[in-house]
Regions:
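Short, structured helix-loop boundary elements
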Residues: 1, 31-32, 65, 69, ...
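Active-site metal-coordination segments of metallo-dependent hydrolases
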Residues: 1-8
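Short, contiguous alpha-helical
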Residues: 8-61, 102-150
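Helix-adjacent hinge/juxtasegments
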Residues: 55-95
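Cysteine-centric segments in proteins
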Residues: 98-100
Length: 150
């Protein structure tokens, strides 16, 4: 559980690092769209982890940077609460969650695997954001885990 909590600390730090970059440079539509996708996907997965219906929730959006800042704060608080609760109740991370994806297909996945996916999904898209920043002549944001833990 400690490793998962650390991965989410990294996720929050990395999201905040991207946000700070976006607040200080002119970014393209693609970068912002990828970032909102990360943040809305985090909300979708948390909703699924709580056993609630996520079928009407967006996973892509054209929101602005102000909305991103709010989503980062909400997601951080909500995941901290969720992780603290499953640690407190000693919930088995191998328990399966049944959910329906955005295409309407039903799946069963362990809590552990969903949490791992959320942490890795964001890192994948932050890499895409950094690639697009480079193309635009903007220095990328170092969101490497090792940089976070130093």
């Amino acid at each position: 559980m400690k490793t998962i909590q650390k991965l989410f600390e990294h996720l929050n730090w990395a999201n905040q690092s991207i946000l700070e970059k976006f607040q200080n440079v002119e970014i393209g539509e693609q970068q912002l769209r990828l970032f909102t996708h990360i943040l809305y996907s985090e909300q979708v997965w948390l909703t699924r982890l709580k056993g609630m219906d996520s079928s009407q929730m967006p996973i892509w959006s054209d929101d602005d940077i102000t909305v991103c800042a709010k989503l980062i704060k909400q997601n951080e608080e909500n995941f901290k609460t969720f992780l603290a609760e499953i640690a407190k109740t000693k919930t088995d991370l191998n328990n399966l969650i049944t959910y329906t994806n955005s295409s309407g297909k039903e799946f069963m996945t362990s809590i552990r695997d969903i949490l791992t996916h959320v942490a890795l999904h964001g890192q994948y898209h932050r890499g895409q954001i950094n690639s697009r920043l480079r193309v635009d002549g903007i220095d990328p944001v170092n969101t490497d885990y090792i940089t976070f833990v130093r």
